[in-house]
Regions:
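Accessory C-terminal segments flanking Radical SAM cores
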Residues: 3-8, 162-230
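Short, solvent-exposed loop/turn segments at secondary-structure junctions
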Residues: 14-16, 27-29, 68, 98-100, ...
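Alpha-helix boundary/capping residues
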Residues: 26, 47-48, 112-115, 138-141, ...
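General alpha-helical segment detector with a strong preference for membrane-spanning helices
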Residues: 20, 41, 71, 150-154, ...
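Short aromatic-enriched loop/helix-cap "lid" or pocket-rim segments at secondary-structure transitions
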Residues: 20-22, 74, 104-105, 128-131, ...
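Conserved AdoMet/S-adenosylmethionine-binding subsite of the radical SAM
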Residues: 71-181, 186
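Conserved alpha-helical substructure of the radical SAM core
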Residues: 1-115
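Short, well-ordered coil/turn elements that cap or connect secondary structure elements
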Residues: 55, 86-88, 144, 199, ...
Length: 230
């Protein structure tokens, strides 16, 4: 499968939570982690623009395996991405809500973000009032979509293809990455064939030394234990 769309750009591969069901806390042992720099982000947007010119770019998620609002440039990133992304395509990300403020939310809305989804994970258990305020605030500012609250680790649990010790519900979905030509650009510019590739095992290139037209998407070892099917 050839590359068709940049599904995700990982604004941050660092998280301020340490959830048992998420590999974010361990991924620094396996790959470079941190906040995506503006140089890397601008280069990643060139790949988005390449897909957009061909009419294949779909939604863009500024979320990978980390908390995007920790990146101090997240508003600027949204503004630049909105300029490149076709108007009909959604620009969004997920947040744990820990650091979301109304000032930040309105700045993101002004920068062109379509919606923000909230994950009810460890942060909610520790500080439900703060995360509930975030949800209320985003709703009041029309920045959440119906069903924009994630409780997947409870109602549709999976073990991230064996990367964490967590129950697997057995629910199977078709893999959108290998069947629809999607990739995620990681915080250091590496390109992976899968959005749950926390440890960087499916790298197929880098935005600086690869060309979009040369990217080939193929199954890799995580596919064998993944909850998605090809």
């Amino acid at each position: 499968m050839k590359l068709l769309t940049i599904n995700s750009i990982e604004a941050s591969s660092i998280c301020d939570n340490k959830c048992d069901y998420c590999p974010a806390k361990e991924q620094g042992k396996h790959r470079d982690t941190g906040y995506m720099s503006m140089d890397v982000f601008r280069k990643a947007l060139e790949w988005v623009e390449w897909c957009a010119r061909r009419g294949t770019q779909q939604e863009l998620n500024l979320f990978g395996v980390g908390e995007p609002t920790l990146n101090p440039n997240i508003v600027q990133m949204c503004r630049l991405a909105r300029h490149i992304l076709p108007n009909s395509r959604e620009l969004h990300f997920n947040t744990n809500g820990n650091t979301m403020t109304e000032e930040l939310a309105l700045a993101l809305k002004g920068a062109g973000i379509t919606h923000i989804d909230v994950t009810l994970h460890v942060g909610y258990a520790k500080n439900p009032k703060n995360v509930s305020k975030t949800i209320q605030m985003l709703n009041e500012n029309e920045m959440m979509r119906p069903g924009g609250i994630s409780v997947d680790p409870i109602i549709r649990p999976n073990n991230w293809a064996g990367q964490v010790d967590w129950p697997d519900s057995g629910i199977r979905f078709q893999c959108p990455f290998l069947t629809k030509g999607q990739v995620m650009i990681m915080s250091n510019g590496d390109i992976t064939t899968c959005c749950i590739d926390a440890f960087g095992r499916g790298i197929v290139g880098n935005v600086f030394d690869s060309k979009p037209e040369d990217i080939e998407l193929k199954p890799f070892d995580l596919c064998e234990t993944c909850h998605s099917r090809i």
